Amino acid sequence: MSDTIAAIATAPGQGGIAIVRVSGDMAEDILRRIFRPVGGKHPLPTHLLTYGYIVDGTERIDECMAVIMRAPKSYTREDVVEFQLHGGGCVAQKVLALCLSSGARLAQPGEFTRRAFLNGRIDLSQAEAVMDLIAAQGEQSRKAAMRQLTGGASSFIRKAADELYAIQAGVAACIDYPEEISEEEAASDLAPRIAHLAKTLADACDERAARLLQSGLRVALCGQPNVGKSSLLNALLGEEKAIVTAIPGTTRDLVEGTLMLSGSVIHLTDTAGLHDTDDPVERIGVDRARRALADADVVLLVLDMSRPLSAEDESLLRALHGRNGCIVLNKSDLPPVLTESDLQDAADGKPILTVSASVPDSLQPLKSYLASQAAVSDQLTLTQPRHIAAARRAVAALHQAEETLRSYSVDLAGVDLQQAQMALAEITGDEVEEKLLDEVFGRFCVGK
């Protein structure tokens, strides 16, 4: 990491400002070469914005603010310089070119954060949280990413690792001093601790919650043709996303939209009406609808309460058994024929909500239901699929160690415990291969 890197840190296109970031030993030399402070002189004070001009020889390139953050009190723990320029691709590209011609090289994706990790300012789980924070679409995801960035996952894993080290020390003592600690005594003392640690880690592995934070809740609206699915989708989204007509079978393909409720991201999919049809195009739509239902986290079965329950409706109700979802009685603004009491037996304990797509206030219970399905505990510790996979490997190794220890094979249990330790170290990056680092930081944008 002896070389100095530079990149544009803001999104391309026109904007209020553009930022060019430089990190490395030559950062201050580059600052001196291309920045002329107004009413001041070099060296600039650290961590203070200074007004001046970017220059190329005697030519003024832009009026800007510049700041130097001297090591180790910077994002990368190296000397870091940032130029805050007028927004626009031309200016930023010119300033970047000046930095490169002055001795820096173009940064790779995620290289600034990678240096923060390699220089010990953050661990790998915190580095990944930076990407999660950038990618967060909802308040719930932002909060989870911020907890991880401030060390939530790190402290949990390090506490688990400390307990594991203590258990390993007990195993080592039994192996080194068998005359003082028998294998039976070691098993009696250590096996319960291993089991407790395995449970603690397993309880933190909530794949569904982690996926909700990463991708949002997938909701599919299903039902027979002309029950108001498309109208309901439009009403929930607050826009005319799907075409609505009185003709059954208007929706033939999937129509998707995204809704934000209580800080959670919810992806809605309106599907073609589920029924038998000889129309080949409509049949394709029905097949796609069934696939969307299979992939959904929540299924909303929409029924028209202004008409009686049909045999096809009853078939859909039976298909909903065992799935996560609710029954939506639509068209409550019309004279009711079908009521909640008519569906109590067929509902299989699922919520029954009465709404009208044409009456916005009636949608609040449905929105509350969807928000509850998308909610994730504020106490969630592991939010990255990679972390959960590593923790599950640690749990499996701990279970094996417990079983081996209870068989009084202390030395073999030590091998299993070492496997668990390596899995935990993968999460924080204490033990990690270069290939994994390339994969993690390759997901970042250039300039971060």
Indicate where each model-derived feature is located:
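Conserved beta-strand segments of alpha/beta enzyme cores
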Residues: 105, 265-267, 351
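A glycine-rich (often HGG/GG-containing) alpha/beta subdomain
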Residues: 1-143, 147, 151, 162, ...
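Short beta->alpha junction loops/turns
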Residues: 23-24, 88, 248, 305-306, ...
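Inter-motif core of Ras-like GTPase G domains
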Residues: 282-306
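Short glycine-/small-residue-rich Rossmann-like dinucleotide-binding loops
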Residues: 237, 272-273, 297, 304-305, ...
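Generic enzyme active-site microenvironment
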Residues: 268, 302, 328
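Switch I (G2) and immediately adjacent beta-strands of P-loop GTPase domains
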Residues: 50-62, 66-70, 249-277, 295-298
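C-terminal-of-GTPase-core extension/linker across diverse P-loop GTPases
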Residues: 2-8, 12, 52, 139-260, ...
